[in-house]
Amino acid sequence: LEIQAIADDITSKYVPPHVNIFYCLGGITLTSFLVQVATGSAMTFYYRPTVTEAFASVQYLMTEVNFGWLIRSIHRWSASMMVLMMILHVFRVYLTGGFKKPRELTWVTGVILGVLTVSFGVTGYSLPWDQIGYWAVKIVTGVPEAIPVIGSPLVELLRGSVSVGQSTLTRFYSLHTFILPLLTAVFMPMHFLMIRKQGIPGPL
């Protein structure tokens, strides 16, 4: 392996003079995601994804586990930071024309990552299975009901049954801890490699 050549390529990449702090928003979003991976992994040691034990396990994490309150708080703060930085990043890219040719596919992968980020928020919000989480899930999963023909089957697919319950929590837990992180781990490198290949767009 030509490790030195790879290291030189990474460390000697030309940075255009117009690049400022606003071009770091995507990197901050990535950092927030990595913090959530670390803290989320720690919380899985204590969280129990059942409707009878989920809330109690979160309470146990917050009150009994050493630094459990800090781990969960950092997870929540970094989640909010990730959403905020992603929104600002989208505005910066749009205002600087970073979505235009030849960077259309970079924009597409970014939009997919945006959808995944929102999905993280929706699924994670339900996991404590408190009153707020329960009713949020009920409302969100009920939205597709308005779609003609496929609305009802889609709602049942999201919930795992006709009503919100254990099947719903299991689905959301699986999405939040396995499927969404896996998809993000696929699209993030694609997004960064495209940026690396095509470079940073010019100034306004």
From Swiss-Prot:
GO terms for cellular component: chloroplast thylakoid membrane. Heme b 2 binds at H75, H176. One of its GO terms (biological process) is photosynthesis. The 4 large subunits of the cytochrome b6-f complex are cytochrome b6, subunit IV (17 kDa polypeptide, PetD), cytochrome f and the Rieske protein, while the 4 small subunits are PetG, PetL, PetM and PetN. The complex functions as a dimer. One of its GO terms (molecular function) is electron transfer activity. It is a multi-pass membrane protein. It comes from Picea abies. Component of the cytochrome b6-f complex, which mediates electron transfer between photosystem II (PSII) and photosystem I (PSI), cyclic electron flow around PSI, and state transitions. Binds 2 heme b groups non-covalently with two histidine residues as axial ligands. Binds one heme group covalently by a single cysteine link with no axial amino acid ligand. This heme was named heme ci. Its cofactor is heme b; heme c. Heme c binds at C24. The chain crosses the membrane at residues 23-43, 81-101, 107-127, 136-157, 177-197. Heme 1 (or BH or b566) is high-potential and absorbs at about 566 nm, and heme 2 (or BL or b562) is low-potential and absorbs at about 562 nm. This is Cytochrome b6. It is found in: Plastid, Chloroplast thylakoid membrane. Heme b 1 binds at H89, H191. Belongs to the cytochrome b family. PetB subfamily. The gene is petB.
